[in-house]
Curated annotation (Swiss-Prot):
Pathway: Carbohydrate biosynthesis; dTDP-L-rhamnose biosynthesis; Bacterial outer membrane biogenesis; LPS O-antigen biosynthesis. Its cofactor is Mg(2+). GO terms for molecular function: glucose-1-phosphate thymidylyltransferase activity; magnesium ion binding. Keywords: Lipopolysaccharide biosynthesis, Magnesium, Metal-binding, Nucleotidyltransferase, Transferase. Homotetramer. Mg(2+) binds at residues 111, 226. The gene is rmlA. It catalyses: dTTP + alpha-D-glucose 1-phosphate + H(+) = dTDP-alpha-D-glucose + diphosphate. Belongs to the glucose-1-phosphate thymidylyltransferase family. Binds 1 Mg(2+) ion per subunit. SUPFAM superfamilies: Nucleotide-diphospho-sugar transferases. This is Glucose-1-phosphate thymidylyltransferase. InterPro entries: G1P_thy_trans_s, NTP_transferase_dom, Nucleotide-diphossugar_trans. It is an enzyme of class 2 (transferase).
Length: 292
């Protein structure tokens, strides 16, 4: 089976969140008890992906390196690349060409939070897909804000539109994408859209026209949270807090995921918990490995 590498796109200027993001990356803001980037990172980890490239702005990349390091503490290999200007999501594959090499890849947006009991199982088919692409569709109330996918009666994708004024369905394409290696050349040959960006929707449309696009449904029981506004930041934090306080279990905790997937051992978790031992996060890690 081919290796699949992951990319987290954590760039952008975050202007919709000004003044909050005037001096700090949006993806470093807290979502309840963790930095935002822990959530997309955890999504890739749950898919079994351990080689991950983080793409961010020139000013924010050193901050991500300070927070995450080389990933070895979680049994990962993290690398970093700079996106000088936000020229579209598909630019990630051009920036990451050397990192991707001859492997398949997955892209997750740094401000997207995914939650659901069967999320690893849902991603498994995409991870194991030998060729083509897989995107994930989610029913939303305001599809005009997103890339929208339209289905025929058999559930096959027949159209993709980016932020349409008159959406043909209520199904948005989420910020999680799995591609085979041909995505790199597609991105390099892509023409900028009317707004001057290399659109991920255009990549997905090429796969669709080739008959190589799979659409997996994130149905009821899944949460897909977009954290692009002040209100959605609060809502995401409240959502995570409600689940964690009710269950006594963490959502998107990289240390726990790494431990449960055997990326790291119990002793390594205990060492990671040391500097955090005075707060609930560190206590949770210690309790988890001791099985109390």
């Amino acid at each position: 089976m081919k290796t699949r590498k992951g990319i987290i796109l954590a760039g952008g200027s975050g202007t919709r969140l000004y003044p909050v993001t005037m001096a700090v990356s949006k993806q470093l803001l807290p979502i309840y008890d963790k930095p935002m980037i822990y959530y997309p990172l955890s999504t890739l980890m749950l898919a079994g992906i351990r080689d991950i490239l983080i793409i961010s702005t020139p000013q924010d990349t050193p901050r991500f390196q300070q927070l995450l390091g080389d990933g070895s503490q979680w049994g990962l290999n993290l690398q970093y690349k700079v996106q000088p200007s936000p020229d579209g999501l598909a630019q990630a594959f051009i920036i990451g060409e050397e990192f991707i090499g001859h492997d398949d890849c997955a892209l997750v947006l740094g401000d997207n939070i995914f939650y659901g009991h069967d999320l690893p199982k849902l991603m498994e088919a995409a991870v194991n897909k030998e060729s083509g692409a897989t995107v994930f569709a989610y029913h939303v109330n305001d599809p005009e804000r997103y890339g929208v996918v339209e289905f025929d009666q058999k559930g096959t994708a027949v159209s993709l539109e980016e932020k349409p004024l008159q959406p043909k369905s209520n199904y948005a394409v989420t910020g999680l994408y799995f591609y085979d290696n041909s995505v790199v050349e597609m991105a390099k040959n892509l023409k900028p859209s009317a707004r001057g960006e290399l659109e991920i929707t255009d990549i997905n449309r090429i796969y669709m026209e080739q008959g190589r696009l799979s659409v997996a449904m994130m149905g009821r029981g899944y949460a897909w949270l977009d954290t692009g506004t002040h209100q959605s930041l609060i809502e995401a934090s409240n959502f995570i807090a409600t689940i964690e306080e009710r269950q006594g279990l963490k959502v998107s905790c990289p240390e726990e995921i790494a431990f449960r997937k055997n990326f790291i051992n119990a002793q390594q978790v205990i060492e990671l918990a040391g500097p955090l031992s005075k707060n609930d996060y560190g206590k949770y890690l210690l309790k988890m490995v001791k099985g109390l």
